[in-house]
């Protein structure tokens, strides 16, 4: 493994030490458990352990949001390219504690910003000194970093080249770092850490390079690994018999975990989404259901042992990974019971509610306008109607399923979804779940995979997509008490950024540059502002000095403007950028 370059810290314009001192509170497990009791702060990547991305702040509401204005902006770095990428982008969610904001750029530099006084002042920047060409060469889907976490007096972050870094919150000095992923194998890290008790949970990307996916827990006190659980079972382990070839395809079977998961403290359970099998499109190379790919996976947080799984698309031939966040909600059930659900909006175009205590299917429905790969879900199991457990290779709707004898096929939704990584949000008062939707179809071409074609740090996909069809988007609301679509606002472009929910508003952005606020009940547009850049990140909200703010990172990057831009030709005018926008009344 290549040796990591030491990270450096830059004091902003030499004045960090001259800023007025403010006492820092340590971020404890108790504070993280009770994050919603600190409404002015945003302490988790997904706002709370349940991943609802709901804030109770309501000074900005449906009646006055029309008066929302830019409060301040800040230019960040990380636009430069590397490897196969011409530029970096912004996909992160700012973390805010007691008026201080922590954000990352695509290369994993961490910025601390003082948000007091109605303006943003850079306190320090930590540059991890990632080797851009080496790491960027195996970043399948963009130069991306989705943010940081807080623990004690440390800012915990990842780098694209596979490091976990702890930075002193006060002075920006690196306290320690350790290598968690191995880019020599094609492993990179783009997701934000999840802090559970005294551990940082890390997910990995790299299924397009023939990795074997995993989740890993690092003890933040000792910097040692506590456990590592592979998402592709080893020989003799439960699920290993779902890889039925004689080529050891499981060893390069994918199952990456690149979106931050959720945590249920009542049962000490981590719930995490698992990505596509590899090679992506040649499912004849890997006969069997290919566990635990395309699954929601529940693990014992203390040991990493798998408690249950629910697989959405067995033997996936479409690159429909299930890597999305699982939102943990409690809703009224029959006869006075309470349903404890994990909600997942899949790239395959279906939304699922799973009993998070058992892993059993509760309900599912399509949330996109067009699904062609299957006729629907079996309402008992939630599996695609055409799924045949006696078959080692699934065809689903054979007319639109690409395979070695039908090398080119058009599928809906396309392999970006559905819903991709951009996070959903859930309003617990309205029981509405908001999904950032990609309304898509694309054309898939399959290439036969052989063991000889598998090489380290080279694409291992068994084909690839092209984009002859226009792709649009929507914000879709689902009533989780009924499992029915409650509303849909169609948008001219795919939703590549994600959702924020407040008591009576929903915030979202467009890759064409607009940030918008919608009525939480009706999805009627109440406010819109064009940032002048491409929105590829989710909005969040915080308060400081008694004033509420909305913040969003702006800078189009990721997979879209490299692999999918032909489906949205109007976005070719959007230039690379790296800006933080903050709004207030």
Residue positions per predicted region:
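Extracytoplasmic beta-rich repeat domains
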Residues: 74-93, 125-149, 177-192, 209, ...
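Blade-level signature of beta-propeller repeat domains, shared across WD40, Kelch, NHL, RCC1
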Residues: 540-585
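Loop/turn-rich, solvent-exposed surfaces of beta-rich toroidal or solenoidal domains
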Residues: 274, 330, 437-439, 467-524
């Amino acid at each position: 493994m290549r040796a990591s370059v030491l990270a450096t810290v830059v004091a902003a314009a030499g004045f960090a030490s001259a800023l007025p001192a403010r006492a820092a509170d340590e971020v404890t497990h108790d504070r993280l458990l009770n994050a919603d009791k600190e409404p002015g702060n945003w302490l988790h990547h997904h706002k709370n352990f349940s991943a609802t991305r709901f804030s109770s702040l309501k000074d900005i509401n449906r009646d006055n949001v029309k008066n929302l204005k830019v409060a301040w902006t800040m230019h960040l770095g990380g636009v430069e390219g590397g490897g196969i990428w011409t530029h970096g982008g912004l996909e992160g969610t700012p973390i805010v504690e007691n008026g201080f904001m922590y954000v990352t750029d695509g290369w994993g530099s961490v910025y601390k910003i003082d948000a007091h006084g109605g303006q943003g002042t850079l306190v320090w920047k930590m540059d991890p000194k990632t080797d851009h060409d080496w790491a960027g060469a195996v970043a399948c889907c963009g130069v991306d970093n989705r943010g940081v976490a807080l623990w004690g007096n440390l800012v915990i972050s990842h780098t694209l080249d596979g490091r976990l870094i702890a930075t002193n919150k006060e002075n920006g000095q690196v306290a320690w770092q350790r290598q968690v992923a191995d880019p020599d194998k094609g492993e990179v890290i783009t997701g934000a850490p999840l802090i559970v008790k005294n551990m940082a949970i890390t997910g990995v990307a790299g299924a397009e390079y023939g990795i074997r996916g995993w989740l890993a827990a690092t003890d933040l006190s000792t910097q040692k690994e506590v456990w590592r659980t592979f998402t592709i079972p080893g020989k003799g382990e439960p699920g290993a018999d779902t890889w039925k070839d004689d080529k050891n395809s499981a060893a390069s079977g994918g199952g990456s975990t690149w979106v931050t998961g959720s945590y249920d403290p009542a049962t000490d359970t981590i719930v995490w989404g698992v990505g596509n099998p590899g090679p992506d499109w040649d499912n004849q190379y890997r006969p069997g259901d290919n566990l635990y790919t395309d699954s929601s996976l529940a693990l014992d947080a203390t040991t990493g042992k798998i408690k249950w799984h629910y697989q959405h698309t067995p033997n996936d031939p479409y690159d429909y990974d299930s890597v999305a966040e699982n939102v943990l909600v409690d809703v009224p059930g029959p006869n006075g019971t309470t349903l404890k659900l994990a909600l997942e909006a899949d790239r395959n175009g279906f939304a699922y509610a799973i009993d998070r205590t058992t892993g059993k299917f509760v309900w599912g429905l399509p949330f996109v306008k067009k699904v062609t790969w299957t006729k629907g879900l079996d309402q008992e199991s939630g599996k695609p109607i055409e799924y045949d457990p006696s078959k080692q290779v699934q065809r689903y709707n054979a007319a639109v399923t690409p395979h070695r004898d039908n090398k080119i096929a058009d599928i809906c939704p396309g392999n970006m979804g559905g819903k991709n990584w951009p996070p959903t949000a859930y309003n617990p008062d309205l029981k509405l779940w908001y999904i950032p939707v990609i309304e898509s179809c694309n054309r898939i071409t399959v290439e036969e995979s052989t063991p000889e074609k598998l090489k380290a740090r080279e694409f291992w996909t068994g084909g690839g997509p092209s984009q002859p069809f226009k792709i649009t988007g929507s914000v879709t609301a689902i009533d989780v008490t009924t499992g029915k679509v409650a509303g849909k606002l169609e948008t001219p472009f795919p939703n590549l950024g994600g959702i924020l929910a407040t008591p009576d508003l929903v915030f979202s952005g467009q890759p064409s540059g607009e940030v918008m606020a919608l009525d939480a009940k009706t999805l009627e547009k109440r406010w819109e502002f064009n940032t002048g850049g491409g929105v590829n990140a989710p909005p969040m909200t915080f308060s400081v000095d008694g004033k509420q703010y909305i913040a969003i990172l702006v800078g189009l990057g990721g997979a879209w403007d490299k692999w999918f831009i032909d489906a949205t030709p109007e976005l070719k005018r959007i230039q690379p950028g790296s800006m933080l926008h903050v709004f207030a009344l």
